[in-house]
Swiss-Prot record:
GO MF term (any one): ATP binding
Protein family: Belongs to the IS21/IS1162 putative ATP-binding protein family.
Binding site residues for ATP: G114, D115, S116, G117, T118, G119, K120, T121
PANTHER family, per the entry: ATP-BINDING PROTEIN RV3427C IN INSERTION SEQUENCE-RELATED, CHROMOSOMAL REPLICATION INITIATOR PROTEIN DNAA
Keyword ATP-binding: yes
Protein name, per record: Insertion sequence IS21-like putative ATP-binding protein
Keywords linked to the UniProt accession: ATP-binding, Nucleotide-binding, Transposable element
InterPro entries: IstB_ATP-bd, P-loop_NTPase, Sigma_54_int_dom_ATP-bd_1
GO biological process assignments: DNA replication
Length: 199
C-alpha cells in the first residue's frame, strides 16, 4: 500500500499536469474525482472517461458563458416569455421554426419588421441566445454601435476587439436600423461589412 506522502506527491503531479495540459476542471476538482473513483471502484477506463467527460462538459459550459457574455444581450431575452396574444407579431409555429435555427445553418438572412414596441429586439435577442446555446458565435448591437465600431476600429482597441468579434460571428443581429439615418459613406461601410461577413 502506498504511503500518504507518495499519494500526496502523485496528486500534486497530476494537478500540475492537468494545469499544464490546460485541463482546469480536472486540476481544480482532482480530489473529488479521485474520491468518487475510489467510492465507485471505477476501472482505469471508467476513471479516465469520467475525467475527460467532466472536463469536456466544463469546457462547453465556459465556452457558452463566454459566447453569452460577448453576445451583447439585454436583460430580457427568454423567448418562452414572448406574448403571442399581440395582434402584430409572429405566431407560435413561426417561433418554433425560428428557434430550430435552420435559417442559420442555411445562411439565410432574417429581417424583423414592425412598429416600435412590437418585440423585434426581444425576438432578435432571444434568437441570439438560442444560437449561443446551440454553440454559435452570435452578436447583437444597434446600427449606431456598429457604425461607431466600423469608423473607430483603426484608432480604438475596444472597437477593434468588437470588430473582430463581429467578423467571427456566425449570427449578427443589427437593431434599431430605422432609427439611424444612413449617409453615403455609411451605406458603403455597411455594404463592405455585409460582403466581408457573407463572403
Amino acid at each position: 500500500m502506498k504511503s500518504l506522502e507518495t499519494m500526496a506527491r502523485y496528486k500534486k503531479e497530476l494537478t500540475e499536469c492537468a494545469r499544464n495540459l490546460k485541463l482546469p476542471f480536472l486540476a481544480e476538482h482532482l480530489d473529488e474525482i479521485l474520491h468518487e473513483a475510489q467510492e465507485k471502484q471505477q476501472t482505469y477506463s471508467e476513471f479516465l472517461s469520467t475525467c475527460l467527460m467532466r472536463e469536456l462538459r466544463d469546457k462547453e459550459r465556459r465556452s457558452y458563458l463566454t459566447r453569452l457574455k460577448f453576445a451583447g444581450l439585454p436583460a430580457r431575452y427568454d423567448l418562452d416569455l414572448y406574448d403571442f396574444s399581440r395582434t402584430e407579431g409572429i405566431d407560435q409555429r413561426q417561433m418554433r421554426e425560428l428557434r430550430e435555427l435552420v435559417w442559420i445553418r442555411r445562411t439565410y438572412n432574417l429581417l424583423l419588421v414592425g412598429d416600435s414596441g412590437t418585440g423585434k429586439t426581444f425576438i432578435a435577442s432571444g434568437l441570439i441566445h438560442e444560437a449561443v446555446k446551440a454553440g454559435y458565435k452570435a452578436y447583437l448591437l444597434t446600427l449606431e454601435e456598429l457604425f461607431v465600431c466600423l469608423k473607430t476600429k483603426e484608432i480604438s482597441r475596444p472597437a477593434m476587439k468588437t470588430y473582430k468579434r463581429i467578423m467571427k460571428a456566425q449570427l449578427l443581429a443589427i437593431d434599431d436600423v430605422t432609427l439611424f439615418p444612413l449617409k453615403g459613406e455609411d451605406v458603403l461601410l455597411l455594404f463592405k461589412l455585409v460582403n466581408c461577413v457573407q463572403g
